[in-house]
Amino acid sequence: MRVADFSFELPEALIAHYPQPQRSGCRLLSLDGPTGTLTHGIFTDLLDKLAPGDLLVFNNTRVIPARLFGRKASGGKLEVLVERVLDDHRVLAHVKASKAPKPGAELLLGDDESIRATMLARHDTLFELCFDDERDVFTILNAVGHMPLPPYIDRPDEDADRELYQTVYSQRPGAVAAPTAGLHFDEPMLAALQEKGIEMAFVTLHVGAGTFQPVRVDTIEDHIMHSEYAEVPQEVVDAVLACKARGKRVVAVGTTSVRSLESAAKAAENGLIAPFFGDTRIFIYPGYHYQVVDALVTNFHLPESTLIMLVSAFAGYKNTMNAYQQAVAEQYRFFSYGDAMFISRNPRAPQEKVSP
């Protein structure tokens, strides 16, 4: 399967650099997987599309201010993007510098260079850093870190992004990118969903910077997926099984919830789904048979990304590419701060051939 088959033309002007003033005020493109029918509306229409007893599964990860600017003690400027917090003082991070720091190198971080860190070791593309500070990593990052806005949001982060680039239900710090489908849910909408009898459950997947890495191979099957830490606790498993038993739909909010739930399904030796705590490299592309997820709330994704492949596996390739073509024609806003889709699963998608 060719990566190029998942390309589409996107005018620069459709990339959203700021969210809508009201979270739930974005547009919603609904795609009926079985028929391919598209419906245009606004995000609060989701209330009418869900039935009492349906289960919404959210990702409650919290974005950390993971970007730090500074320099090596020896002089050269650098930029650090924390990928994973290992303990109170150590992190794995991407380091951008004219010359990569060597083990033992001292780094001066923060806009005022007040934070000292030491480079301990290199692990492939990541650097293990230790902060020489009595405060823990999260406290340091909250004090001097910048919100790690995606590369396509071409502006410096602002104070407002600390709230805007965060879901209202985020709880577990550790992500370096927001689970963006969740950004559209505000408190009034969550209350309205509960009032209607929509069930809710929360997984955790700490989104890594790898989510923005381009696919650098020509053939999808050759791509090596990045690893992310996910947790699907017993109460989520129970909620999913209860939802299926009452004949209702499991609706994943975002591709990270999809990847968490489907990882937990793969891990189940007996039955549909089992608790899952660990790293996942699940790569979902056309041909994949979904085990758990019946419907999906998601944003619009980058051309040739693993996420548009995941959506194509869910809705069908032709349905997905047609929906994206229509979204461009109708001037929907794309990517993290953009508009949303609501998609029901196409049961014929796994058998569909991918051909532009």
Curated annotation (Swiss-Prot):
InterPro entries membership: QueA (IPR003699), QueA_dom1 (IPR042118), QueA_dom2 (IPR042119), QueA_sf (IPR036100)
Alphabetical keyword list: Cytoplasm, Queuosine biosynthesis, S-adenosyl-L-methionine, Transferase
GO molecular function, one term: S-adenosylmethionine:tRNA ribosyltransferase-isomerase activity
GO CC, alphabetical: cytoplasm
Subcellular location(s) per record: Cytoplasm
SUPFAM superfamilies: QueA-like (SSF111337)
A Pfam cross-reference name: Queuosine_synth
Family annotation (Gene3D superfamilies): QueA-like
EC number: 2.4.99.17
GO biological process, one term: tRNA wobble guanine modification
Reactions this protein catalyses: 7-aminomethyl-7-carbaguanosine(34) in tRNA + S-adenosyl-L-methionine = epoxyqueuosine(34) in tRNA + adenine + L-methionine + 2 H(+)
Pathway as given in its UniProt record: tRNA modification; tRNA-queuosine biosynthesis
Function (record text): Transfers and isomerizes the ribose moiety from AdoMet to the 7-aminomethyl group of 7-deazaguanine (preQ1-tRNA) to give epoxyqueuosine (oQ-tRNA).
Sequence similarity: Belongs to the QueA family.
Subunit text: Monomer.
NCBIfam families tied to this protein: PRK00147.1 (NF001140), queA (TIGR00113)
Name under which the protein is recorded: S-adenosylmethionine:tRNA ribosyltransferase-isomerase
